[in-house]
Amino acid sequence: MAIKLTSYYRGSHVPELPGVDTFHSTALFHIFEGTPGCNPLLLTISENGTVLAKILVVVQRIARFIPFYNIRRCVSYGTGEYFCPDDQREPLFNEMLKEITNYARRLNCFVIEVRNLPSPLSGFASFRRNSYFPVNWLRVRNTFTGDEKGIEQSLSQSRKRQIKNAIKNGAEMGTAQTEAEIKAFSLMLKRNYLSKIRKHFPAIEFFEQIQRGIKDVHIGDSWQRFKIFIVKYQERIIGGSVCIYSGDTAYLWFSGGMNKTHLRQYPSVMAVWQALTDANNRGCKYLEFMDVGTPFRKHGYRDFVLRFGGEQISTRRWFKFKWKWLNRLCLLLYS
């Protein structure tokens, strides 16, 4: 099979591509491209002009421990999207994974992370072949039946009481519509976001790009793929969440609220509740909470979201470190 591997570094160079996976879409490429500290790469494999596979990765600047030196990581949300028979997927993914590894090395990334696997065994042989190591992880997922009463029945009694009291005490739910609301939302979330939930928090431009993408017809049906929810009290944004929609699943990417100063409005609870009801109304089968931690230790955010009636599912993430000695050590520890 004579195949062609193509790399796209700029959104203006990306042609129209097939596929419905938002995590490997041109729309998400544009969002990353417009966010400071992010360098996206979109890979495609084609044969005789027909696209067989594609994958989107992004290099993020995550921390600065040493002055004038940036720590970078390369992240892929899944193993890509394929338009070929199942028996061709593994060799195609192996070719893309080799290119991703080389790209991360050129950009001096400290670690490569592949997460959101469709199944724990996805890409197993290719990861092993390219010296990646697995770490057991957890995911929390709510399942919908299409009935809003079913969502309420799955809640804990304390959650039902909190939602009822929040509405009674003046909490209002909606979606971000203006640039001022986007800015207020992102600043609120950054101030109140726990490092235990997610170590990387994007620049404000990330949320601005999402909002522009929702309104921009030039990047396809992105209005169906992203949504920013906000919780208000007396016209002030006190909470909110960001959802990304792909296939039959809604993914809660970010959520948070000003819980200490607005105890009676339960902003974090309302931010999640709004995402759940919207996903159900859209006809999604699942809502998955991203970044709920590993099974090795307690995780406050995981305990928080489990009270919305979701179930824990075992999965794994694959990593590769820049330092060979550290990567070899992890291969021994996690193999």
Positions of PLM-derived features:
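A conserved beta-strand-loop-helix scaffold within acyl/acetyltransferase catalytic domains
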Residues: 2-48, 52-65, 116-261
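Short catalytic-loop micro-motif centered on adjacent basic/acidic residues
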Residues: 111-114, 174, 287-290
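Short, flexible active-site-proximal loops enriched in glycine and acidic residues
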Residues: 66-69, 107-110, 133-135
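A gly/proline- and charged-residue-enriched helix-loop-helix capping module
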Residues: 73-117, 122
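Active-site/acyl-donor-binding loops of N-acyltransferases
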Residues: 9, 56-63, 125-150, 281-335
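Aromatic (often tryptophan-rich) hydrophobic motifs at membrane interfaces
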Residues: 83-87, 91-102, 208-324
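Conserved acyl-donor/pantetheine-binding loop and adjacent beta-alpha core of acyl/acetyltransferases
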Residues: 58-79
